[in-house]
């Protein structure tokens, strides 16, 4: 059974994105369907069938050339009192979870470690991330650890930032200001870097915190365990490492 991976989807979108920016190609956004549905309370769901496509074209009233475009992601505003999930590369539903946020400063962060109480239960975020360190994830006083990704540029915010979506882009070496910060973030990204640890089974019978050993073909990963009532409830990463 085949799976259409996110990497495949990204490659496809990139081809469309690049194609749409060619001076020899034109992409249009159309509006139509002025006549009422047979049942206004039960509008049919589009199926993408050949018939649906034909009817949509026949019902076009106007079309506008798309001269500017951007990749976007679902917008999740950072809000005090909200529980956020740390990014998990083994979570099949990660795209539906709030593992990244955008703040009122238009800074975008990814959560690499959520906060938990002494019993290991997730707690809410109460301290807004505001750092722009392009190299390191930062742990805040509420226990959440955030990695700065980028700041939405003013022009991108004006063109593409909406209540539901936020623009995403790649920075290049010619940029300055927040664009240069994002370029530094991109260059500092290390595939396979350990940024957080998730406890799936805390075991039992511990009289003191066990030593944590991270095995892999990288270097520098170090972590510390914390126990409550003889059970491991947290493992805190002591540093960002390439393991």
Identify the role of each PLM range.
Residues 1-108, 112-243:
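Feature for peripheral, non-core segments
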